[in-house]
Each structure stands twice: as structure tokens, then as C-alpha cells.
UniProtKB/Swiss-Prot annotation:
Entry function: Required for maturation of 30S ribosomal subunits.
SUPFAM superfamilies: YhbC-like, N-terminal domain (SSF75420)
Family of this protein: Belongs to the RimP family.
GO BP term, pick one: ribosomal small subunit assembly
Cited Gene3D superfamilies: RimP-like superfamily, N-terminal
Protein name: Ribosome maturation factor RimP
NCBIfam families linked to this entry: PRK00092.2-2
Record GO cellular component, one term: cytosol
Lineage, uppermost ranks: Bacteria, Bacillati, Actinomycetota, Actinomycetes, Mycobacteriales
Keyword Cytoplasm assigned: yes
PANTHER family: RIBOSOME MATURATION FACTOR RIMP (PTHR33867:SF1)
């Protein structure tokens, strides 16, 4: 039978994801191998205001597998279900992404024609995410040496991606950002570095052909 669409899978799992306190960030369906008859791999990306732990993601994956099996959208074909939280390289595209990234360093590219927040600045720059206020985001520029806060309309930002940090920000820099989002680790700490390095591996995998398959870490 034909492979179901990503839109159809999204419709089937959206209610469950919301009930479990997550946001559905995306669904991707690929083949788990190079052969044309390789089993489908369904990757579901979820996130929440607090840091999602592996147990919660694993439980959601098990429930999601039941939902997909009950609808029989894959027929008798085995498939691989992978539920994961967003990696740090996933762009910030919605207001909630900015809210959850508060306190983190991001690489920003402005839209053509948008004025850089610092006079004489370029359209591409790094900043620390501050408090989201409606359609504007506070950004802390200048790093540890000269931290200062500016405001930029979200509409002026073409692309923004969180950066992995290996040392903590300056105290004043983080203060101007308003701290970090609740439930998220402080940037540059061992906990944050470990989370950034392992977040794409925090998956719960269930194959319809093998119900004993467990959790990959």
C-alpha cells in the first residue's frame, strides 16, 4: 500500500501530543535504508516549555505507536517510529521557539532590507535571546565585554539558529536577557552541553514488526 503522507500522520497524532503537554513541531517520513522496499521511518518532533525528559518521550512514543497501529495506515508493512525533541540546529520559526530559547545564544540572519539593530552592523550576527514581547524579541548584543539590549521585530528575522556554548555567558549578559527559560539548563554548563550533544539521540523507537524493541539512548 502507498506510504501515508506526513500531513495524515500529523493529523492522527496531534491530539495525543497536545494531551500529553507537548507541541507537535514536525513529522517526517523517510525510508530506513537505501532500498526501495526498506521499511518507512516516521520521525515525530515534539517540544514543551519545560525540558522534555527521556521517560516522557518514551511514554509518548509507545502511545503514538498504538494510535498508528489502530488506524492501520501502514497496513501489514513494518515501520519504525522515532519520537524526538528538536535538535539545536532546528531554526526558531514560531514565537514559542523564541520563548523557550530565552538566555541562549543564536545566530541571526535578517531579511533583505531590514535594518541591523546596531548602527553599522551586518545582516548576520550573534546575540543572546531575551524576553519575547508580542511581535518583538529582546536581544543582547556585545557578548561579555559590552552587553547591551536591543529589540528586533520578529518579522525582520529571516533565520535564527541556537548555538552550542562551551562556557557560561557573563552575568550581566544573562541578566539583560532576563535569565533562561523555566526548566531549561543554564547555557555553557555541563548539563546544557550534554543536552545539546545528545538531544538528537533522545529518541524512543518502536517497530510495528517487533513490539519488544526498546529505547535508544
Amino acid at each position: 500500500m502507498p506510504m501515508p503522507t506526513e500531513e495524515r500522520v500529523s493529523q492522527l497524532v496531534a491530539g495525543l501530543v497536545e494531551r500529553r503537554g507537548f507541541d507537535l513541531e514536525g513529522v517526517e517520513i523517510t525510508r530506513a535504508g537505501s532500498r526501495a522496499d526498506a521499511q518507512p521511518r516516521v520521525t515525530v518532533v515534539v517540544d514543551s516549555d519545560g525540558a522534555a525528559d527521556l521517560d516522557a518521550v518514551a511514554e509518548l512514543s509507545s502511545e503514538m505507536s498504538v494510535v498508528l497501529d489502530d488506524t492501520d495506515i501502514f497496513g501489514d508493512s513494518p515501520y519504525l517510529l522515532e519520537v524526538t525533541t528538536p535538535g539545536v540546529d532546528r531554526p526558531l520559526t514560531a514565537p514559542r521557539h523564541w520563548r523557550r530559547a530565552q538566555g541562549r545564544k543564536v545566530r541571526i540572519t535578517l531579511r533583505p532590507g531590514a535594518e541591523p539593530p546596531d548602527p553599522g552592523g551586518s545582516a548576520g550576527f550573534e546575540a543572546r535571546v531575551g524576553v519575547l514581547d508580542g511581535e518583538q524579541i529582546a536581544l543582547v548584543l556585545g557578548g561579555k565585554r559590552n552587553p547591551h539590549r536591543v529589540r528586533v521585530p520578529l518579522a525582520d528575522i529571516e533565520r535564527a539558529v541556537v548555538q552550542v556554548e562551551f562556557s557560561p555567558p557573563g552575568a550581566r549578559e544573562l541578566e539583560l536577557a532576563g535569565g533562561v527559560a523555566p526548566g531549561r539548563p543554564d547555557p555553557g554548563t555541563d548539563r546544557a552541553i550534554a543536552a545539546d550533544g545528545a538531544i538528537s539521540e533522545e529518541t524512543s523507537t518502536a517497530a510495528a514488526s517487533d513490539p519488544t524493541e526498546g529505547i535508544e539512548e
